[in-house]
């Protein structure tokens, strides 16, 4: 989820982490209770390729839909919930300053990057809500998790699902038991359904009309 409000325009790859439509943080804040989940904004794929080129845009879209519902100002609080989500950058920054002053851990932005990871991934108070920087940090976390999970001999899709669990919890199991991995997969299906053209279904066989 710069002192200037980020534009909502979504402005090769070393590896591609892909969730098949048919079918990352050491702390676990409440997922940001943003507005109802919506389809990826127009141009998100191009934006994702520019900001997090190591992760397939479809995978990122599913992750971001689950984490923040594409709200760049979303805030998730560890062990608690906000009464509502911020409606502006200024409100988001005021909220995170208040949380930090009380020693409360939180995650922010599109990819819900936890504040304990800011230094490692190049974020700070002035940049944590910039969509591209936030997405780049989230992509880096997921890529690191995937490198760890794929090194265990898992098949590619199993390794990706384990990486999603790692993104959520820092390990390869909690994301499954909590239902997080299933929610990301469901988001991938919803994105594919809402972003593409629905196929024509098969017609039912009906008896010929009586003559």
Language model region names:
Residues 34-43, 48, 192-211:
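Proline-rich, low-complexity linker regions of envelope-associated factors in Gram-negative bacteria
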Residues 57-62, 73-75, 150-164, 196:
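Surface-exposed patches in mature extracellular/periplasmic domains of secreted proteins
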Residues 64-68, 112-117, 141, 152-179:
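Acidic helix/loop microenvironments that form the catalytic cleft of cell-wall polysaccharide enzymes
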Residues 34-35, 46-51, 78-83, 99, ...:
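Second-shell loop/turn segments in exported
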Residues 4-18:
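Bacterial N-terminal signal peptides that target proteins for export
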Residues 89-157:
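Alpha-helical segment that forms one wall of the substrate-binding/catalytic cleft
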Residues 11-12, 24-98:
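Export/targeting segments at the very N-terminus of extracytoplasmic proteins
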């Amino acid at each position: 989820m710069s002192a200037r409000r980020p534009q909502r325009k979504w402005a090769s790859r070393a590896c591609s982490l892909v969730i098949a439509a048919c079918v990352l943080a050491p702390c676990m804040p409440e997922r940001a209770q943003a507005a109802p989940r919506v389809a990826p904004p127009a141009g998100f794929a191009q934006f994702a390729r520019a900001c997090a080129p190591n992760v397939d845009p479809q995978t990122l879209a599913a992750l971001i839909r689950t984490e923040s519902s594409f709200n760049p100002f979303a805030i998730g609080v560890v062990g608690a919930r906000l009464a509502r989500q911020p409606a502006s950058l200024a409100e988001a920054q005021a909220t995170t300053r208040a949380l930090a002053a009380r020693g409360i851990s939180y995650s922010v932005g599109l990819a819900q990057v936890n504040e304990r990871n800011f230094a490692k991934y190049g974020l700070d108070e002035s940049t944590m809500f910039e969509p591209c920087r936030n997405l780049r940090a989230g992509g880096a976390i997921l890529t690191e998790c995937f490198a760890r999970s794929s090194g265990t001999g898992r098949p590619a899709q199993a390794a990706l699902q384990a990486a999603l669990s790692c993104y959520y919890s820092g390990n390869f199991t909690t994301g499954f038991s909590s239902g997080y991995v299933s929610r990301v997969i469901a988001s991938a299906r919803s994105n594919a359904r809402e972003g593409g053209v629905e196929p024509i279904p098969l017609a039912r066989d009906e008896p010929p009309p009586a003559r």
